[in-house]
Amino acid sequence: MRRFLLSLFALATVAVPVARAQAPEALWYATNDERSVQSFLAHADRVSVIAPQSFSMDSIGIIWGQVDSRMVAAARAKHVKLIPLIVNPGFDQSIFHRVLVTPDSRARAVHNITALCRDNHFDGIQFDFENVRVTDRDAFTSFSREVADSLHRVGCSLSAAVVPRASDYPGPTAYHKWIYDNWRGAYDYKALADAMDFISLMTYSQHTRRTPPGPVAGYPWMEEVVKYVLALGVPPAKLSLGIPSYSEWWYPTYDAAEGPRMTGGGLNFDAAQGILARNGAKATWDDKQKEGMAFWQDDGINEFLFLVDARSFAARVALAKQYGLRGYSVWVIGQEDPAVWR
C-alpha cells in the first residue's frame, strides 16, 4: 500500500507536461537494408543520432557485425552521432541470460562492448536486448552499470531500447503474465536511466497476434506509458519516446495449432499506400489515436490497415515536446512517409 501511495504521489508531482527549450534529439534506427541506408544518406542533416541495428552478441560475450560504410561516412560528414545497437540474436532469451549469469562471459562482454565503441570511434552503444526474463531484471541492471562505467571511461555513452509497460501489474490473463515475465518486466526503468545516459521507450507495436487489431502506437497508450515511466522518477532528459515510422496491415491467417486468427504485419509507407489502392480503401484519421485507419472485406472477412503518416508522426513528436523529453527514437528510417522530412 505504501508503494502504491508513493506511486500516486509521483504521478501527481512528476508526470506533468513541461516545456523543453532545446530541440528534441532525433534518433533514427537503421538497418543495413538499402532502403534504410538511402533514406539516411538523403536526410542525414535532419538526424541527431543514427542507431543502426548492426551488432549481435553471443552467449560468451563475443560480438560481431558491422555498420554500412556509407552510413559511417555520412554520419561523420554531417556530424550525426553514431550509436549502433547490440542485440541478442533472434532475441533469444537463453543467450543473454547466459551472459548475465556466467562471470567469464559477462566480463568478456563488458570488455568487448567497450573495445567496439572505442576502437570504431562510435559515440556510444545502445542495448537492444529483448525477450529477457523478469527474473534477470537485477542482473540486467547491474550488468548495465558495469558496461556504462566502462564506456564512460573511454568517452562513450550507453543507452538501452526498452520494451514499454504502463504498470507493474502483469494483467488478468495467462498471456498478460507471460508477456510481462518474458518481455516487459525485465526493465527497471529508473535504475537503468540512473546508470545510463538515456533510455529509448519502444512505444510501438502496441497490439500483437494475441490481441484484437489496433493502432501501431495509439496516442493515449503512448501517453500513459510516458506518464508511468516519469512517475517512477526517470528524468525527462533521459527519456526518448519511441515512434513508429511503419504502418500495420491486419489480415486473416490459419495455422494448425491456433486455428484462424488475425495477423499484423509491418509495412513501409509506400507499401501501405499500395495495399490501400489495391483494395479501393482510404485511411480515415482517428483523432483520439492520432493514426489513420482503413478497413475492407476480402471474401467477407474484415482486413484492417493502421497508417502512420507525417500527421501521426508530428503528433508524437509533439508528445515528446509536451513532456519535455530528451527526444524521440524512430523505428525505422526508410519506412517513413516522405512528408515527415518536409
Regions found by a protein language model. Name each.
Residues 312-342:
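Acidic/aromatic/glycine-rich contiguous surface patches that form carbohydrate-binding/processing clefts
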Residues 4-15:
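Sec-dependent N-terminal signal peptides
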Residues 60-62, 66, 133-276:
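Substrate-binding surface in catalytic domains of secreted glycosidases
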Residues 22-112:
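Glycan-recognition patch characteristic of GH18 chitinases/ENGases
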Residues 91, 245-318, 340:
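Glycan-binding loop/region signatures in secreted carbohydrate-active enzymes
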